[in-house]
Amino acid sequence: MGQKVNPIGLRLGINRNWESRWFPNFKTAAAYLGEDHKIRTYLKKELYYAGVSNIVIERTAKRLRVTIIAARPGIIIGKKGSDIEKLKDTLQALVGKPLSVNIKEEKKAQISSQLVAENVATQLERRVAFRRAMKKVMQNAQRGGAKGIKVSVSGRLGGAEMARTEWYLEGRVPLHTLRAKIDYGFAEAHTTYGCIGVKVWIFKGEVLTKGIPAEVKEEQQKEGARRPKRAPKRENSGKAE
């Protein structure tokens, strides 16, 4: 099952948080979901070259807050914050209610699965060989600290008449392990031969139930093994005179 299901949805509430954070009632659920879809679709299309890795939408009783996590936040903010004000006005007109927009920088773009997938898709649209594009991003991800990465491309690869799927794996990507912190991204490359789908899985390490990384636990175990063991206390078997 872990091989088929979306690894992000499988780990929600375990080591992954929701991207839409609000509590609706029966009447407002459909309206809120539609607003979230409009916001995400618009931002993904307009800010594609800013490298948007994630969009978090939070709601309170009277307020809506949109947090955009991007690799190149300067493109979104603009000169002296002019572009972000235009973006805010556009989103308010789109959903018909006041909102605030926050921008955060994606500091590790090399191991962000969504950005890696979009990078491969962009290279395929520029007619770069798909194997070269896949191996390049996998090398960059491992340099960035990824424990494992899997990249899959599907479609008319290299202009072949019959569509097929090819994938490469470096390191380990334990999809069945729920405590494994796995990021997943998907992108599409629109080429002259048709649409090519790109999927990326990145394994960033294991997180224990209490939130302690597995690497820290290993170091603690090594430190415990290095400590010299004390000799057991000798019991005085002789009788006191």
Swiss-Prot record:
Q: Annotated region Disordered: where?
A: 214-241
Identify the Gene3D superfamilies for this entry: 3.30.300.20, Ribosomal protein S3, C-terminal domain
Annotated Gene Ontology cellular components are: cytosolic small ribosomal subunit
UniProtKB keywords: Ribonucleoprotein, Ribosomal protein, RNA-binding, rRNA-binding
CDD domains from the UniProt entry: KH-II_30S_S3
GO BP, sorted A to Z: translation
User: InterPro entries per the record?
Assistant: KH_dom, KH_dom-like_a/b, KH_dom_type_2, KH_sf_prok-type, Ribosomal_S3_C_sf, Ribosomal_uS3_bac-typ, Ribosomal_uS3_C, Ribosomal_uS3_CS
- Source domain of life: Bacteria
Recall the GO molecular function terms of this protein's record.
mRNA binding; rRNA binding; structural constituent of ribosome
Q: Where is the KH type-2 domain?
A: 39-107
All disulfide bonds of the chain are none
Q: Where is the composition biased (Basic and acidic residues)?
A: 215-226
Presence of keyword Cytoplasm: no
List the NCBIfam families: rpsC_bact
List the HAMAP family hit by this protein, alphabetically. Ribosomal_uS3_B
- Family to which this protein belongs: Belongs to the universal ribosomal protein uS3 family.
Entry function: Binds the lower part of the 30S subunit head. Binds mRNA in the 70S ribosome, positioning it for translation.
Q: How does it assemble?
A: Part of the 30S ribosomal subunit. Forms a tight complex with proteins S10 and S14.
Q: What is this protein called?
A: Small ribosomal subunit protein uS3
**Species:** Sulfurimonas denitrificans (strain ATCC 33889 / DSM 1251)
Q: What is the lineage of its organism?
A: Bacteria, Pseudomonadati, Campylobacterota, Epsilonproteobacteria, Campylobacterales
